[in-house]
Every structure is written in structure tokens, then in C-alpha cells.
């Protein structure tokens, strides 16, 4: 496997989410580990060119047939090998929800479904491909872990952890090439279900997931002379880190940030958790309202829906002082 030193951390950041996926899958197979790879006509986009060249017997391309992607992957997994399955996040959630529910969730198949280009990264292709409600859909299917890594280093660790976990996993990949680096030191511990505290404060907790974790960090930096913020990378949405959420109960304000609809996403999951608690913090959810997001670059769409670092900081100040 790749040595995640400072040089390779920068390398993964330059490759982006899809390139990192291809790298970790290739490294896993190169180490002679057991794995099958299935894709829905996205071999190149998934970074699997070297996999096809060096391990053709381990790669299946089902074509533009996402429902079949899930069925074939679940079938392969029945023979005992873990399976990586890839397509665009809009299609791995909305289009195949029936198959995911039956063949992954109910059957507990050892399939790791990768939703590529989740969030706003495909906004230039219009709404048919962008801002999929993937967290919301996957949260309604019992028995599936949901991972949402924030940078190249964490994608690498998350994919390895998912492969080695026996059972169905959904990984949503957000961000493009030249991803911002959140983890400059890869020696940190990545554990499914265990969130990471990136910055420690005692007044406000910013909880983010996916590539927008960097916006949360930058917002906290903008506020450093006014408010004391904790910043948390909630890389696992199912299961949530309940231990950490208990520790945050006495914070003055919790702010969840996500490139996802407010309905059914990370903020909803955390609100549902606190609904059963007698003592709970004030909580605001920053995400996409009940709208169709516009076309444009990721930065443009973030600005339009209030998720730039500056807008996050401004909203926190407004809520904290109200």
C-alpha cells in the first residue's frame, strides 16, 4: 500500500477523489489482496485504467446499467470476495435504491458502493448529475455504513477500512482534482464510526462532512478572534459517533455543514440523535434548502446556497448573537 508521507499526501490531493480511488484500489490488488471491482461504464473516470491493464480478471464493466451494477456486485460478493462498485453518486443512490435495499442492505452483501462526484462537483452538468440526496436515501436502508471522507488521505484510509469491513458500505466522494489538504499528517487514526476533532474549542462546534470540512476549518479561522470553535470531521454518518455527540451536549451552539439537502443529511441525523436527549445544544443545519441547485462551479454553487467559508462564519456570528 502507499506510504502516506507528506509527498504522497500532496500526490493524492493533486489526483483528487477519483484518482485517489483508483490508486488505493490498484495498491490493494497489487499487494495480492482479494478484491473484485465492478463499474458502470466509468472505468477511466474511476481511475481504473491500471487495474484493467494489470488485473483484468478482477474488473467487470457492466456498461451504463447501474441496476445491474448492484446485482452483479452482490452476486460476486456471494463467492466470498469483497467488491468495489462505482458510478456517479446520483445514480448509485436515486437510480438504484431498490437494488441497494434488496441486494446490499437486506442480503448484507460485502459490497462497497462508491458514489463518485457527490455534492456540487458536477454542477456544470446541470441538476441531473449534481447534489444527489445520497445520504438521505442510504440512511433509510438498514444495515449500510455510510462514509464521507474529506480529502485524499482520508479517502485512501476510508476505502481500505471499507474493504476490510465485512458488510455493505456506501462511500460518497466529494471534491475535484487539487483537493484541499485537511490531514497534513497521515498518522492519525481512521476508524469507522469515530469522528475526528480537527480543532478544539469550547463554545461552538462546527461538524462537517466531505470536502466541505475545509470550509468549516476556514470559517473557524475567520472567527478565531471572536469565537472559540471546535471543528469536527464527521467522516462516518452511519453510525454516528454517539460518544462525541454526548460530549458536545453542553456547547452553546452546534453547526452542521454539508453539500447535501438539509432534509435527510448529516444535520438531520444529528438532530434525530439529540431529539431523544433531555439536555441538548442549540443546533443549526447549513446545507441545501428545498431547491434545485443552480449550474456552475463548486465555489459558485456554495456561494448561492450559503456554504462558502465566509458565509458559514457570518451565519455563526448571527446565530450566536441572536
Segment roles from a protein language model:
Residues 1-172, 177, 189, 304, ...:
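Thiamine diphosphate
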